[in-house]
Amino acid sequence: MDLSAFPYLQGNYAPVDEERDLAEEELRVEGEIPKNLVGAFMRDGANVAFQPNHYVYPLDGDGMVHAVYFKDGHVCYKNRWVETSHLKTERKFGRTIYGSVGKLLEVPQEVIDAGGEPNPVRNTANTNVIYHGGKLLA
């Protein structure tokens, strides 16, 4: 992706382009992790999956959950895309199709005919993570 025209997608805000599972040996840990610290810290945020086709606001982008897991004095990291119908449709077509709240784009008829998401308002699922009914939701 060429993101040079998008200042909100530079540096620390640049998108992560792959899902990763990192063991403790692959992470930089400073100090010691308490053995009784058990659980996970999760963060959901905007992460564009395809080359933007319009101005990008800092909160535009598909959801990606980053998680750090703690157990028995050890730590690991995982990140995963939030599998929305909009992201699945764009993956199927291999390109950006939908706009954003600030710039709605008409969904191409070919996308609708192929069973893609017809709603032009992208569900980014990039704001929060909640555990409900035995499932992790974004």
Regions found by a protein language model. Name each.
Residues 1-138:
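Beta-propeller domains
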